């Protein structure tokens, strides 16, 4: 596991520290809380070459502001890979993947790292949780992708209250209208919006040598991956969905999203290196 502090304006490395938490291990996400850093991730991973689901054992760690490790606690009783952590009203909310990546898992913890409750969400097939956000009103949004009751991987987004009760869920995919059996819609991040809804970012495309189709409306091939954004209303209705792509045919996939004060979206894009996409206010 590693923690790297950067100078914000230049990107220069201020400090870098690594920690051996046991076997193949990593921090996946980190937040600040009362002059400490709280990081979640995993250790003792079986699949050390995989960065999506490593078949590891979930952990939560506390570090001081200078990056020195204070303690690490196992969360493996509840989930295999902790992927995101948020702070709300002096509680920690941790989400990630269950054993064998079958379900989304959400934990509510106190600041002494005691688990108050654990909830699972999903269907009968694989449900992979990679994104979480909590809005100012305390609405929790989880997102990722699912094979439950879908023809292939579709985006899977859930709105949850602070007691862990599901308010709504939505599965959406295949924005270009291809044969859904061949299309992967893989979601990586979510941000709550000020209207009680949320916006998710995904990548959409196919990974099959025996399938290749073209979208008449924009000329893209199913083999060309695109950035895929979906805006949900407060009640879970899809308000709009758009794709964004490389006009020269390269692959793009949305990996992370943040919202500006002007209600614009900035998306981190996997384009074979590292890119950014800015979306006008919506």
Regions found by a protein language model. Give the residues of each.
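A sequence-level/structural motif corresponding to short, flexible coil/turn segments enriched
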Residues: 1-282
């Amino acid at each position: 596991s590693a923690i790297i502090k950067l100078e914000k304006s230049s990107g220069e490395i201020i400090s870098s520290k690594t920690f051996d938490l046991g076997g193949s291990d990593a921090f996946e996400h980190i937040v600040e809380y009362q002059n400490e850093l709280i990081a979640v991730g995993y250790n003792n991973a079986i699949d050390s070459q995989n960065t999506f689901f490593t078949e590891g054992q979930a952990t939560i760690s506390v570090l001081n502001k200078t990056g020195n490790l204070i303690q690490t606690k196992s969360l493996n009783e509840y989930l295999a890979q902790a992927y995101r952590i948020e702070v709300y009203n002096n509680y920690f909310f941790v989400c990630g993947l269950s054993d064998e990546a079958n379900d989304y898992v959400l934990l509510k913890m106190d600041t002494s790292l005691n688990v108050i409750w654990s909830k699972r969400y999903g269907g009968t097939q694989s449900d992979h949780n990679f994104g979480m956000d909590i809005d100012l009103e305390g609405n929790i949004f989880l997102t990722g992708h699912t094979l439950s009751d879908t023809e292939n991987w579709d985006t899977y987004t859930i709105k949850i209250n602070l007691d862990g009760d599901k308010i709504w869920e939505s599965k959406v995919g295949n924005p270009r209208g291809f044969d859904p059996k061949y299309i992967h819609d893989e979601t990586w991040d979510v941000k709550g919006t000020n209207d009680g809804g949320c916006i998710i970012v995904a990548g959409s495309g196919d990974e099959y040598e025996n399938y290749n189709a073209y979208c008449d409306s924009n000329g893209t091939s199913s083999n060309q991956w695109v950035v895929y954004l979906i805006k949900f209303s407060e009640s879970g209705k899809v308000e709009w969905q758009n794709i964004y792509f490389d006009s020269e045919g390269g692959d793009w996939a949305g990996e992370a999203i943040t919202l500006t004060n002007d209600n614009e979206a900035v998306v981190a894009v996997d384009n074979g290196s590292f890119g950014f996409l800015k979306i006008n206010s919506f």
